[in-house]
Structures are given as structure tokens and as C-alpha cells.
Amino acid sequence: MPAQVSHIIAAEEALRLALPELAETWGIGSDWGLAKDCADDRAAAWFRFGAQGPDIFYHNQRTKPSGIHYGALAHRRNYGLAVEAMTAALIEAKAGFDSREAAWLLGFATHAAVDRAIHPFIVHFAGWQSPLIPESARYRSCHPFLERLLDIHILGTLRGLPIGSCNLEGLLPLGGRERCEGSDGGSFDAALGRLLAKGLRAAFPAAAGADFLIERRIQNAIADAKYFIRVTNPSLTSAGSQSLLPWFDDLSGWRSMALIYPEKLPTGLDVANEEGKTWEHPAGDGRSYTASHGQLFDEAIASAAAALILVAEAIAEARIGAGFASAIGNGGLSVADEDGIPVPPRVSKPLPLKEVMEEEFARRIRAEQGLAAGRV
């Protein structure tokens, strides 16, 4: 799945395309000049956080009860049903575009389009570990590392910025649970928990319908996602600040690079397929492409913009039209067949990402040792 920065940029570009007046109202433009201020109380920040979609559940590995299984479910099926139910809830609550709930939901509505467009590309070029193929162990941790390389690529392409200048604490609401109030006066994280619970119960009645802890799981996922985003913030990418990373030391090994942003793309490696080489869909069903990451990103923006228009029109008209959920899409967000049914990956041609990670790890260890020597 694309990482945090890619989802933010795709959502912003989709909003500027679909709802330019709202983008202007929220201060979302082609640069991040407003990102220097604390983001906690701004609609734009919650829109960007919503764009992280159900990925927040994958980060829910510190706080119990966990909702990590909802991340897997939401990536497999019924995303459109979840968005439809939450849109209906906002219509019933008469929540307008000035509410944080609406801002978050609009962001959430963009997530599926971005995953569907780009995730197969990532799987093809990163590979995966199979327990049946021992030599595939080299590909473990390469997937999230490629996600971060593609963040670097798209940030440079569409924002003209180096990754080290990207401070997510200025773009996302990463404060504590009680920093922002919801429309009912309580914690906004709690309000968000109630809204997302309605979406999950509509999409996954068997799993979520009787889950009396679902709102607590969602709040825990939000808290853990905020923590994860803070400690993997691209602004910590430089060798001078890597000592702030809680998992990095000389014993952590090359796999510890999986969640760390290199300062620049590796020389001589076409991570974005800008040369237009043919690659196969990892489903192994004969689909093949020559699209670059940038071209796929443009497709993702267009599809996300269509989703934004659907949700915005429904809220503005206080009515959900026929076919809403299917237009958002209920198929899988990762490797799926042409009908959207999730299938295991079968075909890939991985880039030499392990070697890049090993080189990056060695470089950072040398830099850390140099810093340590300077402190003596």
C-alpha cells in the first residue's frame, strides 16, 4: 500500500481537482506553506489524516484492545459500504463541510482509489516473502521500503521538495487524544470512533456488529497511528537526527531501514519505472502494463476526485444516490482479480531493494559512529 506522504499528496491533488473552492477554504494548495503551524485544529489536517484510511489499524500494535484485524478486512472488501454508511451518518447529524468529521471522511474516501491504482505496482517491484520459498526471505521488509522510496519520488515530482523537509507534525493532527473537541464537545478521537464504527458495522456486520469494544479499538488505532507517524516522520530522516528513531542501532540490521526514509533516491535505480518497462499485474492473470508510478498516481488522483465528488454531493444534497457504494468500490485494495476479488500474489520482478537497504544501513551506522566520536 502507498505510504503516508503519497496518500496525503493524492488526497490534496484530488480535492483541488474535484472541489477547488473547498481546497482553497482549507488552505490546501500546491505547496505546504501553511504546514508550519500546529495542525491539530484545522480541517485540512483531519482531511489528510482521513486519507490514511484503514492503514491506521495496521499501526495499532501498541495499545489494547487492538483493531488491527479491521485493517485487513477493510483492505479486502466493502470499502464503499463503509463510506456510504458514514456519509449517511453525517447527513443524519446535519454535519457540514465545516465539521472535522466531514473533512476526515472526505479524506477517507480517497484512500481506496490510491491503493487500487498503486498497490499492484508496489507488490510487483518489491516482491514478498513466501514460507514455501526460503530464498524469498530477502524480500521481507522491502515492501514498506519501496513505499517510502515512492513517497520521495512523488514529493519531489509534485511538491518539488526533498523528503527531509517534510514534517508530518505540521500536516497531520498528531497531538494527544484530548487536544481537539468533536462536534458534540467531547474528544474528537471519540467522535471519530463512533463514526468509523458505524462504517465498519455496515461493511462487516459479522465481525463488527457484536464488537462492544469497537469504538475503543478505533481510538487505540488512532493513538497508535499518531505515534507511528511521529516516530517515522520524514523530517527525522537525516543521519543527524536518526538517533531519535527508537529502533535504530548497530544491532538492528538492514531490515530496520524499512520504515526510515533515505535522504534521496538511490542512484541508477528506476524505482518509479520512468523508463516504461513492461511489468505484470501480481495477480498473474495476464494483465501487463508499461505505466510509471507517476502515471499511476495521476490515475489515482482522478479516481479519488470522483469519490470526493460523490461524497460531497451526498452531503450537500442530504441524499445518497443509487449505486453510491459500488461507485466508491467494494473490491479489494491490494492484489485483486479484474472483478476486485482479492487473490494471492503470484508474479513479481523485484528491484534489488535488499542491497539498497544494506547500503543505507551501513551508511547510517558510519554516520552514527562519526557523530558519537565527535561527542567524545
Where are these regions (language model features)?
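N-terminal leader/auxiliary helical segments
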Residues: M1-G107, A112-V376
